[in-house]
Amino acid sequence: EPFCISYHGVSRANVKEGDKVLVVGAGTIGVLAAIAAKAKGATVYISDVSEGKLEMAKEFGVDGTLLNDSPEHFDKGVAELTEGNGFDVTIEAVGLPSTFQNCIDACCFGGRMVLIGVGKKNLDFNFTLIQKKELNVFGSRNALKKDFLELIDLVHAGKAPLEKIITNVYPFEDAAKAFADFANNPGDMLKVVFDFSGINK
């Protein structure tokens, strides 16, 4: 289900072979969006504030990473990765005003930008850049039946290493510890699975 959310967003942005894509946010949804974009033939980079998350993202075949530790470093990295042109597609997978602005700044003229991250704060951003750059901005939530069907084919074709997404397995009796660990996630946890095999029926 999380993969379908990411895949639907990538499809909304019409990611295709030859596109240069930047995913902003290397959590579960962001990493899955990167996998989906790679499967569609794009060159994919992923950005995050956490070096640990970026190291983990490399295991999923992204073409490069960009540490977003300051606006200056982010902008410089985008310019270097795109020869100053910007990315064809930017994917917002965090839901913060700052990462929304990152996606606007990193997108090329006439580029596509899709919002997957769910925000809780009102946005305060430079909307004139959307006009000046003639950006195409897409919202995305959940998924469609066709997304599930296409993903089944993708998994069967071996283009989606989903087994790597499950980074931690806890016995059910350790559920409280699992939630505490995830709340303090240093960046090396993506999806957590509970093992119910030890429960007496």
Report each predicted region and the residues it spans:
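C-terminal hydrophobic helical "lid"/dimerization subdomain
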Residues: 101-105, 145-201
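Anion (oxyanion) recognition and catalysis
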Residues: 38, 131, 156
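Mid-domain Rossmann-like dinucleotide-binding core that forms the NAD(H)/NADP(H) cofactor-binding site
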Residues: 1-71
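Glycine- and other small-residue-rich loops at beta-strand/loop junctions that grip anionic moieties
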Residues: 22, 26, 46-47, 66-67, ...
